[in-house]
Amino acid sequence: RDIAQGDCYLLYECGKPIATFVAKAGPEPNYHRIDNGSWLDDQPYYVIHRVASLEGVHGVMADIINYCSAFTSSIRIDTHADNRPMQASLIRLGFVYCGIIYVENGDSRLAFQRVF
């Protein structure tokens, strides 16, 4: 569905795809409720989902954020509590932990936002 809607992107290095992600304009239904915190603002934002990269490839989040910052001034993203590398990457890239959101099946995710 993300591909059909034009929201799925590939990141290339030397002509070879090394990562994929989804970036789409909010609002994100799962982000209406946030516990133990709040979003940084109520302005329009983009959401990044489903980030994946080839094994051994590092630093793609910086490239993804740089790309997305060309068309939005606010990005929201969530990640699993066990995904420590993603959390560290987000903090390093200037994201702020905002609270806990819940996905469709009720599982919790840590929510982050960066305003440029």
Description of each model-found segment:
Residues R1:
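Conserved GNAT-fold acetyl-CoA-binding loop/helix
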Residues G6-A23:
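Conserved beta-hairpin
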Residues V22-G56:
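Conserved acyl-donor/pantetheine-binding loop and adjacent beta-alpha core of acyl/acetyltransferases
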Residues I48, M86, L110-A111:
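Charge-biased, low-complexity intrinsically disordered regions
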Residues S53-A70, Q87-R92:
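Conserved acetyl-CoA-binding loop-helix of GNAT-fold acetyltransferases
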Residues A70-D82:
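Conserved GNAT acetyl-CoA-binding A-motif
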Residues A81-I100, E104:
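Conserved active-site alpha-helix within GNAT-family acetyltransferase domains
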Residues V103-F116:
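C-terminal "cap" of GNAT-fold acetyltransferases
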